């Protein structure tokens, strides 16, 4: 099964080797027929502490690294 890859914005880098990434998705509301934005926060592993708040990054699903962390930062420069 292929690993999921998501694009999001770093909202926190206070933890060591961990960043919190907010991923927004857009969908049509079934009743209102209106485009709605929803966001979700993922904890991702950042081995070298390269990411800063506001960076647009790609995260990829991986094995569980800790209780809450099962994503890893793939690339912080190419995500646009």
Swiss-Prot record:
The GO terms describing molecular function are: rRNA binding; structural constituent of ribosome
Instruction: List the SUPFAM superfamilies.
Output: Nucleic acid-binding proteins (SSF50249)
Could you tell me which InterPro entries the record lists for this protein? Answer: NA-bd_OB-fold, Ribosomal_uS17, Ribosomal_uS17_bact/chlr, Ribosomal_uS17_CS
The record ties this protein, via Gene3D superfamilies, to: Nucleic acid-binding proteins
**One cellular component term from this protein's GO annotations in UniProt:** cytosolic small ribosomal subunit
GO BP, one example? translation
Report keywords, A-Z.
Ribonucleoprotein, Ribosomal protein, RNA-binding, rRNA-binding
Family that this chain belongs to:
Belongs to the universal ribosomal protein uS17 family.
Q: What does this protein do?
A: One of the primary rRNA binding proteins, it binds specifically to the 5'-end of 16S ribosomal RNA.
Q: How does it assemble?
A: Part of the 30S ribosomal subunit.
Return the NCBIfam families for the record: PRK05610.1, uS17_bact
UniProt-listed PANTHER family: 40S RIBOSOMAL PROTEIN S11 FAMILY MEMBER, SMALL RIBOSOMAL SUBUNIT PROTEIN US17M
- Protein name in the entry: Small ribosomal subunit protein uS17
Species of origin: Chelativorans sp. (strain BNC1)
- List the taxonomic lineage: Bacteria, Pseudomonadati, Pseudomonadota, Alphaproteobacteria, Hyphomicrobiales
